Amino acid sequence: NGVTEEVGWEFKRLNCNNIMIITDENLIDHISVTKTIKSIEQNNLNPILFSEVSVEPTDSSFKKAIEFAVTNNINGFVGVGGGSSMDTAKAANLYSTYPADFMTYVNAPIGKGTPVPGKLKPMIAIPTTTGTGSETTGTAVFDYEEMNAKTAIAHRELRPLIGLIDPENVRTIPPNVVACSGLDVLCHGLESYTAIPFHTRNKPETPSLRPSYQGSNPISDIWSLTAVKMVAKNIYNAVNDPDNHEARSQMLLAVTYAGIGFGNAGCHLCHGMS
């Protein structure tokens, strides 16, 4: 509990000074954001707030964040919120570090699918929902408006350097959100466990072309199955008893476990249909 308070220390250790805090307008006064700002200031660093994250990010909303990062000479990123905030932070980090036409890094066949050239600037993820697991993945999902299609940018270098998993940030989530996001966690675990096995896929021409999602494998299976068991044990109490902090803490941990699982193995039918 309370690990959000360490975010400023982490950025100072990483030699960052201009820190872009990416969140949405509904979280500006939430404890997760106020603690993040305070911690950065206490470490004599410069917090720069960007609160224009879209609930469902689009290429346009990503471009706003990218322009903001470039204009403000950002050298450290922290995504505070759900998957939308964290994915927006990944995109802002990528394109401000390696500027390119927007479609360059977008997954083929919609985009060019060009591999990320190298390391990005330090990014820390602070999740405030018990759902997406974006703090563990190298994927930034968005709606491509021109085609009315959901796609993503996916590469291992997009993974946040640090995830601060703080139960205090999920204590006030409405029960219906805990329920819906909890089913997302369940799908992450089940889909990654039943994904096409890694050994049935063709070897890429070079390691740089290896996809972010490898298929089910013995290591991701451990994380995925553990997450499913944690959801089964805790989701009822997390939804129906908001004061059951242990149940909500376990759901938040399950999110991260499932994220490590599907962040390596990938998802399939449910997420593909959505």
Specify the residue positions occupied by each region the protein language model found.
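N-terminal amphipathic/basic leader segments beginning at the initiator methionine
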Residues: 1-14
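Predominant activation on well-ordered alpha-helical scaffold segments within soluble catalytic domains
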Residues: 8, 37, 48, 63-66, ...
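Conserved beta-strand elements of the Class I
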Residues: 20-21, 76-78, 124
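N-terminal small/polar loop signature for handling phosphorylated ligands or for N-terminal nucleophile
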Residues: 28-102, 236-248
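A glycine/threonine-rich phosphate-anchoring loop and its flanking beta-alpha core
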Residues: 98-212
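Active-site segments that bind and position negatively charged phosphate/pyrophosphate groups
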Residues: 198-274
